[in-house]
Amino acid sequence: MSAMQYYLQTQRADYNVCPYFYEREVKIMEITGIALQTVTAGEDVAFTETAVNGTKCIVHRQGSGIIKLRGITNQCKARFLVSYSGNIQIPTGGTVEAISLAIAVDGEPLQSTRMIVTPAAVENLFNVSAQAYVDVPCGCCSTVAVQNTSTQAIEVQNSNLIAVREA
């Protein structure tokens, strides 16, 4: 039984329940980018498939690298947990050096989510992952993306981004 069904069934004269359950419904979106893609320095990883559709508080345009988190809430803020995992490598012809991705909020990479690897050679795949809480004030919006924070173009494959409304 969902929280909404429970609330509606308990509305009797002798039994009242506060409708705080509206905020507790599960809101989640999962988007992926399975194909190998080249991401230039400072650009966002594109997500081409939607595995789990979001709700009106988590919005994504197919093929875009950005999701929009909306602060639709009766509280002071909405809290989202954003998780990313994927494989990265230096493309053929690239320089062997440290490469990195980071979760970016409103265009600014979060340094605490920076995923750094140093391959021994080009085309060596490494798996990276990070997650961060993002607070969105009531009535506002924030954008979230996964950004290439390296100094060169990198190749990304099997990207998976999950956004979950926590509170």
Spell out what each predicted region is.
Residues 4-167:
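Extracellular jelly-roll beta-sandwich "head" domains, especially the C-terminal globular C1q domain
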